[in-house]
């Protein structure tokens, strides 16, 4: 059985590692990012992939910079026949890419060359796509630009969030990898070059991208909310305070108003005007310093003073 080194870090990578184990490959080592402080107490927390690897007694390496000779040589010492990566988080050096007999392959959560980069699942929803998928390709030193080996499409539903789509793509990626490796080893795959002119990019989400722009059409704002759910979460501002908007729905606007204006307050939501006739009913939110709550809870408590005509999103962040 061929010897594999697996490189991955977040939850997305775990079903892929599990599949490799289930398929009986000799997993010589798992390479993941260093433990990081998390939560309010800033406790050092291991990456999900490390936790999974340790359950199976697989050696774990946690290089800070995989491109440094001393660090990548630790990986080469395992003499892998194949390196598989999935959301590892660092670009590999040529010495690693060239070493394995069957190369280095990556499981990427988009239909390349679309959405290269670290946040393809977010952008698929932010851009209102109705389908995305998983690509398995050879790794090169350029970001997600290697030759394509296999792909599978995954539909995006109207109610998918980053969370639900993440799980679908992770499972689809594990299944596709299970089908791809035997074909790769048997020499049955013809790599297809990516058309760089058709490449689009999904760079990691920045804080300023999380803010809701109420002047946009309601459909875009709905995609914005679900495209940042459950992380990092869309937000708006009200009276100088930040509100995280955990969920909202598209509804017909009961009347015209300046974008960001509260145009209706109902039992289960705050209806806000947008840049077109589709309003957004905020149904779940988290005011600064408070817990996440549904709109009904908010309107009974901290939001009891809200009235129609008040405006969201105009103020500078405090």
UniProtKB/Swiss-Prot annotation:
Q: Which GO terms describe its molecular function?
A: methionyl-tRNA formyltransferase activity
Q: Which CDD domains match?
A: FMT_core_Met-tRNA-FMT_N (cd08646), Met_tRNA_FMT_C (cd08704)
Q: Which UniProt keywords apply?
A: Protein biosynthesis, Transferase
Query: What is any Pfam family matched here?
Result: Formyl_trans_N
Question: What EC number(s) does its UniProt record assign?
Answer: 2.1.2.9
Residues bound to (6S)-5,6,7,8-tetrahydrofolate? 110-113
Which reaction(s) does its UniProt entry say it catalyses?
Answer: L-methionyl-tRNA(fMet) + (6R)-10-formyltetrahydrofolate = N-formyl-L-methionyl-tRNA(fMet) + (6S)-5,6,7,8-tetrahydrofolate + H(+)
Could you give one GO CC term from the UniProt record?
A: cytosol
**Would you identify the family this protein belongs to, as annotated?**
Belongs to the Fmt family.
Task performed by this protein: Attaches a formyl group to the free amino group of methionyl-tRNA(fMet). The formyl group appears to play a dual role in the initiator identity of N-formylmethionyl-tRNA by promoting its recognition by IF2 and preventing the misappropriation of this tRNA by the elongation apparatus.
Protein name, as recorded: Methionyl-tRNA formyltransferase
Organism, scientific name: Geobacillus sp. (strain WCH70)
Give the taxonomic lineage as stored in the record.
Bacteria, Bacillati, Bacillota, Bacilli, Bacillales
